[in-house]
From Swiss-Prot:
Domain of life, per lineage: Bacteria
Name this protein carries in UniProt: Large ribosomal subunit protein uL15
Protein keywords: Ribonucleoprotein, Ribosomal protein, RNA-binding, rRNA-binding
Location of the region described as Disordered in the Swiss-Prot/TrEMBL record: 1-51
Subunit and interaction comment: Part of the 50S ribosomal subunit.
Ranges of Gly residues composition bias in the record: 21-31
Entries under InterPro entries matching the protein: Ribosomal_uL15, Ribosomal_uL15/eL18, Ribosomal_uL15/eL18_sf, Ribosomal_uL15_bac-type
């Protein structure tokens, strides 16, 4: 066997159909598109959700819900995330400087997930009941 004799196995490669190249090819003239109509034209596609002029499903159903603007600037952080902070007092700006939260976040709630090893002081952040108990049990404080 030589490199110049290697070829793909029979039937593993499909040749692309050459359309519009004469009657004998079987794909001449209309090129497999049929006669007339929107789909036979160049660029002839119907938009997504179009139902032929019938009121489409997305307009037949009522509107619902909304996107809370406050949710975009609110974040929950785990108790274990606070172990990355070396400061004794933790507030919103400290969390931003340690890249625990992004700059756009304005409201933070600390939730009970993971554990914390050293006493810390939480200032002006919301804290869940479980996280509050965990922080206070090791001698930490929560200032409102």
């Amino acid at each position: 066997m030589y490199l110049n004799t290697i070829s793909p196995s029979r039937g593993s490669k499909h040749l692309s159909k050459r359309v519009g190249r004469g009657i004998g090819s079987g794909l001449g003239k209309t090129g497999g598109r049929g006669h007339k109509g929107q789909k036979s034209r160049s660029g002839g596609k119907v938009r997504l959700g179009f139902e032929g002029g019938q009121t489409p499903l997305y307009r037949r159903l009522p509107k619902f819900g909304f996107i809370s603007r406050k949710a975009m600037v609110t974040q929950e952080i785990r108790l274990s995330d606070l172990s990355r902070v070396s400061d004794k007092v933790i507030d919103l700006n400290v969390l931003k400087t340690y890249n625990i939260i992004s700059r756009k976040i304005k409201f933070v709630k600390i939730i009970m997930s993971g554990e914390i090893k050293r006493p810390i002081t939480i200032r002006k952040l919301r804290v869940s009941k479980g996280a509050r108990a965990a922080i206070q049990s090791i001698g930490g404080q929560i200032e409102e």
